[in-house]
């Protein structure tokens, strides 16, 4: 069922979203034989220093590039360099490209801004997809934060763009610790045909833990029920109407607050 939902051939199971991201990047580097990871400004990909350099972390990794989303200069960089193994995207950034996700400090700040332009972000992802394909760069969607909130097929379905690898996390396990990587079969192999002994390991004592797998099965079973399928069919209309109604009430009461949403 994960193959069907993600549209990918192979699956691996881990114990957290961060581990899933680490494995996806590791496999991308292994198969492309390139060194560099590209992430986008302010995007959250867990606590691994390679995907989250900054304050409170060790010195920024030399093999991580932080670029801007929805920027032609980023595509130019991807086309000009020969050492980029993968680009990782957190689709929740569609609400606030190149700005940080909400946290305690920003939620208390009246200067917080967000807004979603689905068509513009989808167009950006399509251009990014085309550039990655052209340059042999692995495109990774990190869907751990968005889960399956946007669509039954996740952000790939919602934005109409197919990534080479996708990571999922806590949503699948109903809150239990889980990380999942779905990807093309050629990228998910732990060995290379020309050097079969050069293995790309991904070990974990609790990977695919039976308790977590059972919780995941319960979630996927629920996803297949008719009421949930019906809910997904009306998701955009439902949340557009709710947001409009809520924003009208905020406006009527003279409150300088508006809500932004994706789905």
List the predicted regions and their residue ranges.
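Conserved PLP phosphate-binding loop immediately N-terminal to the Schiff-base lysine helix
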Residues: 90-122, 136-159
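Structural motif of enzymes handling amino- and sulfur-group chemistry
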Residues: 204-235
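Active-site PLP attachment segment
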Residues: 159-191, 208-215
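Buried hydrophobic positions in well-ordered alpha/beta secondary-structure cores of metabolic enzymes
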Residues: 2, 24, 37, 64, ...
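Conserved PLP-dependent catalytic core of the aminotransferase class-I/II
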Residues: 226-263
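Helix C-cap/helix->beta junction micro-motif
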Residues: 31, 129, 134-135, 253
